[in-house]
Amino acid sequence: ERGRTEIDIPSVYTRDGRTGNRPTENRLTENTPTGNERTNSPTGNERTGNGRRSYLPAIEVEFEPELTGYYWKRSGMLNIQTKRGCPYECIYCSYPHIDGQCVRTMDPEIIAENILRAKRDYGINYLFFTDSVFNIRPEYNVRLAETLIRRGTNVAWGAYFSPRGIDAEQMRLFRASGLTHIEFGTESFCDRTLEAYGKRFTFGDVVRASRLALDNGVYYAHFLILGGYGDTREHVRETIENSRRLEYTVMFPYAGMRIYPHTRLAELAAREGVVAPDDDLLAPAYYIAPDFDLEEARS
């Protein structure tokens, strides 16, 4: 039976990460506005050092020495953020709630310095920028790419991109700075479904962005959500048909949408009776459109 999930967690501390190295207890006793800092005691009493009044204008970044070698040795890649926050309103996504909708960027010089240090100390040659969407704040992205080139990082990188908000000049610059592959959070190749999902681009944007990647020798993939809110059999057929217009790509299709708290999808799912309004959603719950047929999509 779904509902409230009982878990035993003695305390919770949340804040805008990478705000420095002062101990947690100092941040709670000093009233410095570094973001959302909160503890919940076992008795249920909440102690707030700083309510989230605003977000940091910039985020610090540094590879943790004790973890860098471990992850590089076992995975062959490292991850790093260049910005935090997402201004988009995709109905299923929890990033705007977790990271905020205010975009905060990291100093390109510090990013380059960390990459060079990791390359020198561990021999890394590939990393992934884990921004929710890389190609927002285009002026910043240009500055970052130019910094990577100027500092001679010479490390291949990939990132999550939106199909909208990238032009030929930027793609060439990113490629010169080390971009080797893109993962597009496309979700559908049908404009009607894209609108239902809260996307701000069209299939025409998808075709153009894919062509830009192909023309610049950048590998690219598209993630797809079939049977999400507003999707139908007809829309799925259109997505499958349109997929044939994209060349030399990889597609990752998923069936249904995971319902996360504080999203538009959670509100819609509760309204339709898919989940209860007070469901904490810690146990996974999924929305699958009534008109979606998984077996038909597979065939």
Q: Which stretches of residues belong to each language-model region?
A:
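Long, intrinsically disordered low-complexity tandem-repeat segments
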Residues: 19-48
